[in-house]
């Protein structure tokens, strides 16, 4: 069994980037590589083909499978938690809806999830040469350690050597590295083989003394330092990344994406950010919509609750005014449902209010049902090919008003679709932007841009990390004789 766990000092430390780049670097060596994340907490997900229909996994693991040149499958992300509120998450197990968990009943439910997640790892390990597993958050969350099956709980199960990634751009990375190891039990410390520094800016010679001291103090090696790079873009899994997302270009047409509290699949607008004539911004105040050329209502895990938030902020009036002025509005999945006449959830699928009036811009009604739609649809819009993926409980009933649009309807300047990923299709995106904004086709290719970014990440990993040493580490048990750092776990 050959595998490696990429853990991190914190959330958003760079685990996903290192895992993705390492998958590409190892795939280039002719190895059959699979990514794996036992449990992902994200509302950014993707549908891939399963044995009996579509299955849902985290978007990051889908991209990592592309990096590994492997076919994405449910075993690569066996447990996906999709937060619907601060204390309640929808659980996807092996690609299928499993139920809901809250903070109060999580301890009881995770035993079954842990067993399924570790069985999925064992299945992959029997079919692939190398498994590059990604941890979640930090392995040193003292209050969560007893039931951990994602970080060192997985490493113990599979005997995985573990490398910890730290983001030096935030500061405090040496304390974070040392503290991560020192707060682990002796058994878990023995699994930590070393470190990777992420997002370093400046002269590596200035960092070298600190790395030598870290190796001396911990008895563990540093496997390399990834530089900060302005062109590193990947489908993200974490809403933390929204804080810095925009693609400012002077004189460009502005696309304002409403930053809903429970936003999901916000990668739907990444393709717009690729266009040279567009400036994509995330907005949470009505004033940000006033000068927008296109307003986007994205997907959400809690449609009715986020619609109430929209109204509480006055954003509903801003959207209505935008449409009344003849300027385009686009709703995707939950955002599409908000644009309709009414949303009904009589069975409490979303766990909140059972009914709400929509914005009334599209002649549709939405009813939530228990069964989740997981599909990979294809279609056309005015002779332009279109495709996407569907992940939703809402069933749309269109009225007589409106024209057809892929996965939805159009009424004048207002468009709605249930298809995520539709605008990753270059032909549909070009046609839509020409129709709505008069923006000429740029020739930009989103699939090529993603592949180029994955290759760039693979190049950076090859250049700045000791990939051969990491592969040797994955092929063997963790090094023997690693020193214990006090105090250990409380």
From Swiss-Prot:
Keywords: Cobalamin biosynthesis, Glutamine amidotransferase. PROSITE patterns: GATASE_COBBQ. Pfam families: CbiA (PF01656), GATase_3 (PF07685). SUPFAM superfamilies: Class I glutamine amidotransferase-like, P-loop containing nucleoside triphosphate hydrolases. GO terms for molecular function: ABC-type vitamin B12 transporter activity; catalytic activity. GO terms for biological process: cobalamin biosynthetic process. This is Cobyric acid synthase. Pathway: Cofactor biosynthesis; adenosylcobalamin biosynthesis.
